[in-house]
C-alpha cells in the first residue's frame, strides 16, 4: 500500500510566514534574458499547466493569482496559501515520511515560471544563479522553520498535535515488510 503525503497545516503556516518574511529573489537583466530564451522553448500547454498547478494549491485566491501571472518570467510575489485538499502529486518518498513525522513542503522559484519538471529546460536552470537563488531561499525558509520549532514549544506542540490527530484517524502501515534489511551492493 502506498501512502499519499499528509500535509501538516501548522507546519505549513510556519513555513509560509518565512516565505513572506524573506520574499522572493530579485533577478538581474542577464538572468531575465536567459529566462526569456528558455521561455521561448515552452509550449502554451506548459504555461497553462503551470498556472493550473499554481492555482489549485491556493484555493479561490490561487486561481485569481494565477490569472495575474500572465506572461511573467518569474513569480514576483508569494502565492496565496490556502488549506485545501488539492495536492500536487509526484514521485517522492516524502509521502511515507509524512506518516512518520510532521512534514511540510514549500516551493521556491528555482526556474522560469512554466518550466515543466524533468525537462532539459529545468536542468539547464539548476546550475545557474536563477536556480541557486531559489535554493538559497528554500534553505533559509527551512532553517528558520526548524529554528522556530526548536525555540517555540507551542509551535512544535501544534505540529505534533495535528500529526497525532491525523495518524489516529488512519494509522500508517509501512509497505516494507518487517525484518527486511538492506543488502550490500558489493563485497
Predicted regions and their residues:
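Metal-dependent amide/peptide-bond hydrolase catalytic core
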Residues: 1-187
Amino acid at each position: 500500500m502506498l501512502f499519499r503525503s499528509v500535509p501538516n497545516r501548522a507546519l505549513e503556516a510556519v513555513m509560509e510566514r518565512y516565505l513572506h518574511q524573506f520574499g522572493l529573489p530579485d533577478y538581474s537583466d542577464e538572468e531575465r534574458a536567459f529566462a526569456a530564451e528558455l521561455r521561448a522553448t515552452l509550449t502554451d500547454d506548459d504555461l497553462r499547466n503551470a498556472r493550473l498547478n499554481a492555482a489549485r494549491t491556493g484555493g479561490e485566491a490561487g486561481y485569481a493569482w494565477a490569472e495575474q501571472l500572465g506572461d511573467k518570467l518569474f513569480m514576483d510575489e508569494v502565492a496565496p496559501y490556502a488549506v485545501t485538499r488539492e495536492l500536487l502529486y509526484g514521485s517522492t518518498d516524502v509521502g511515507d515520511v509524512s506518516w512518520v513525522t510532521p512534514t511540510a513542503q514549500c516551493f521556491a522559484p528555482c526556474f522560469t515560471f512554466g518550466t515543466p519538471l524533468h525537462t532539459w529546460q529545468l536542468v539547464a536552470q539548476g546550475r545557474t544563479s536563477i536556480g541557486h537563488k531559489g535554493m538559497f531561499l528554500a534553505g533559509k525558509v527551512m532553517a528558520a522553520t526548524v529554528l522556530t520549532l526548536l525555540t517555540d514549544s507551542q509551535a512544535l506542540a501544534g505540529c505534533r498535535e495535528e500529526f497525532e490527530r491525523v495518524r489516529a484517524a488512519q494509522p500508517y502501515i509501512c509497505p516494507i515488510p518487517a525484518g527486511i534489511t538492506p543488502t550490500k551492493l558489493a563485497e
